[in-house]
A protein has these predicted regions:
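Formylglycine-dependent sulfatase
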Residues: 1-408, 413-414, 423-448, 458-465
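Short arginine-rich
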Residues: 451-455
Length: 465
């Protein structure tokens, strides 16, 4: 593009797709995001390439599936030297790039996450809102400067107050970055920790959401039996009924965290208006993966591919160039966000790139209901046994317009859902002989896709022999 805009890229952590009022949830409070939906395009069927933080982020930061970039686990020692992350490519193209919050392409356990060639001039790190890092944790330093003690506040009845919250800190740093930018176009990658567990919003927000008024999770009693068959597949928490999980209470606290995110996100947009930069700034709102929140008797995340866990919000707004108030139900992968950002910043897509730009839909040049024939997600030994008690699971999801196939490799189990008739995935058709034809067809399609899309054939061929 000859007209290169600024890019505000706001990424939450573990936020489900169905948590925005304007997209059909009457129980949340998201006026800022509702306005963003009306001012742009919401891709309502966007899927992450792993239901776990690091492999998902590795994928959309590189434009490759996690297994292709060889970064499939949380807690990994290092990030590969190749491929370059997209922010490095964008910085090399002349953008002033900033990062606030969590990056999580490598382990931040017992250490500050090491920097890579990431392209960021402005770097304000905070992996999580805990005081667990001796150095390099900008948020903890910010809290201490204001007389706060993070660990004590987190354990108090009122939790961390809004004025000292990580989400507030992130907005303060974003406002600082936006106000100090010069003549170069800029990209700000802002990554807040919420609504990631533990679900501990400030009391002032928690009090706004009554658990008794929550709709509760998507759960049927048959889910308990279905999950028993998958008991050998990694997950962070035990299968329980909604009552045992206090699912409505968790939902209320989760929505409270999102309400706070919405308010702080609005402060950043107000700064864009005040500085006269709104018209030339593309705004993107998304998340790295979802949250089970009691669906199917599950809480948190792990080796499953249910809609609440792998489907995420993705909203683009740039009223100057993009269509307004458009909702696209096309199948989208998070790598497509990466391709779109490269195209917006004038960076040619590398020949290895697996993302597909969304600009034709955003600008009305292509059908908003068509983008990909299928989307994929992977879980390859992604969580440490410390979190799951398991021994490492390998699984893949292949989702078409009508069906979802999940194969738990080496376990002898799988899932097949007819999404047109069972959108919340309560009836597993894997063992139903009536559906054996479509199951076998999808297994073949998924195998082909895995071989063709994730096989690394090695170095470049330079001669016939």
């Amino acid at each position: 593009m000859t007209d290169r805009p600024n890019i505000l890229w706001y990424c939450t952590d573990q936020q489900r797709f169905d948590t925005i009022g304007a997209l059909g949830n009457p129980h949340v409070r998201t006026p800022g995001l509702d306005d963003l939906v009306r001012s742009g395009t919401a891709f309502t069927h966007t899927y992450c390439q792993s239901p776990i933080c690091t492999p998902s982020r590795a994928s959309f930061m590189s434009g490759l599936y996690p297994s292709r970039v060889h970064n499939t686990r949380n807690g990994n020692e290092s990030f590969p030297e190749w491929p370059p992350v997209i922010t490095k490519l964008i910085a090399d193209a002349g953008y002033d790039c900033g990062m606030i919050g969590k990056f999580h392409l490598q382990s931040a356990g017992k250490r500050t996450e090491p920097r890579i060639e990431d392209g960021f001039r402005y770097w304000k790190f905070s992996h999580a809102p805990r005081d667990d890092w001796k150095e390099g944790h900008d948020y903890a330093d910010w809290v201490r400067e204001r007389g706060g003690d993070l660990n004590r506040l987190r354990e108090s009845e009122d939790r961390v107050p809004t004025e000292l919250h990580q989400t507030t800190w992130a907005s303060e740093r974003a406002i600082e970055f936006i106000r100090q930018t010069g003549k170069k176009p800029w990209l700000l990658n802002l990554n807040v920790y919420d609504p990631h567990p533990p679900f501990i919003p400030p009391k002032s927000y928690a009090d706004q959401f009554d658990p008794s008024e929550m709709p509760g999770p998507h759960f049927e009693k048959s889910d308990l039996e279905a999950q028993a068959k998958l008991a050998d597949c990694d997950f962070q928490d035990e299968v329980r009924s909604p009552e045992e999980h206090d699912a409505k209470g968790a939902q209320a606290r989760y929505y409270a965290m999102i309400a706070q995110i919405d308010d702080q996100f609005g402060r950043i947009l107000q700064t864009l208006d005040e500085t006269g930069q709104r018209d030339n700034t593309v705004i993107v709102f998304t998340s790295d993966h979802g949250e089970s929140l009691g669906d199917h008797g599950l809480m948190y995340k792990g080796c499953r591919f249910y809609e609440g866990l792998v489907r995420v919000p993705l909203i683009f707004s740039w009223p100057r160039r993009f269509l307004k108030n458009q909702q696209s139900d096309a199948l989208v992968e998070m790598m497509d966000l990466s391709a779109t950002l490269l195209e917006l910043s004038g960076v040619p897509l590398p020949d290895y790139f697996q993302g597909k730009s969304l600009l034709p839909i955003l600008t009305g040049q292509s059908d908003a209901s068509e983008h990909r024939n299928f989307v994929r997600s992977e879980y390859f030994d992604a969580l440490d046994p410390h979190f799951t008690g398991g021994s490492g699971t390998y699984a893949t999801m292949h989702r078409t317009q009508t069906h979802k196939l999940c194969v738990y490799h080496g376990k002898g189990v799988g899932e097949l859902f007819d999404l047109a008739n069972d959108p919340w995935e309560h009836r597993n058709l894997w063992d139903d002989p009536i559906h054996s034809k479509i199951k076998n067809q999808l297994i073949a399609e998924s195998f082909d896709a895995h071989v063709l899309l994730t096989t690394d054939v090695g170095s470049k061929r330079i001669a016939p022999m």
